[in-house]
Amino acid sequence: MTDNNATEDSGLQESFLSHLFELRDRVIKAALAIIIVFVCLVYWAPDIFHLFAQPLLSALPAGGKMIVTDVTGSFFVPMKVTMLVAFIIALPVVMYQLWAFIAPGLYLHERKLILPLVVSSYTLFIIGMAFAYFLVFPTVFKFMASYNAPLGAEMSTDIDNYLSFAMTTFLAFGITFEVPVVVVVLVRMGMVPLAKLREIRPYVIVGAFVISAIVTPPDVLSQLLLAVPMTLLYELGLLVARLYVPKPSEDEAASPAD
């Protein structure tokens, strides 16, 4: 009896260590993918940052410039932006490593669901960032700049502050555009019935405005630009989730007849 328990404990320990080593290897491969892309892009770091800052630069008055208040800011900020771009480009590899690690523990029907979820999640995240870059940034910056002229103030933004603002906004809109995926997963896995998600629609709308008030600048325009898409994407998720409502088992289907 003791020998059997010892053998079982030894097997569990070996299994845990093998999973731990595999996780380490997957993390290393994902990190290497990001580093390789970063090294390939680092030469163009100033150009990447200029493109990154273009929405703000275009809103500045003629001759307006961004400023640097930190001695190392002009070097590290473009590097951070380039690292962000490298992460986005390498994200499919990162997702694949995550998928390869968890796939052996999933059922067949769960594996079939993972691939479309990963592809749609990545696509929607990129669309969310593009929405922020091409629509939200120009709209907000021009709106803010219009208030400076009557005050006789000149808008000169520090590049480090701009980086923090832009990354927070990118993350907020990227996650916001994941709402349809979250809704579909909740319905498909049977965690929340579709009818319940429809029932809590008013609370979701209120929550969207609360979240937008927290993560966006304190102006109504920015909050609307986040809250309205979040609400519409929730509705889109409800529509798509209708296709993924789990079918009742034979026993559940036959129970009313009993």
Please place each PLM-identified region on the residue numbering.
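Membrane topogenic/interface segments and analogous intrinsically disordered interaction regions
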Residues: 1-258
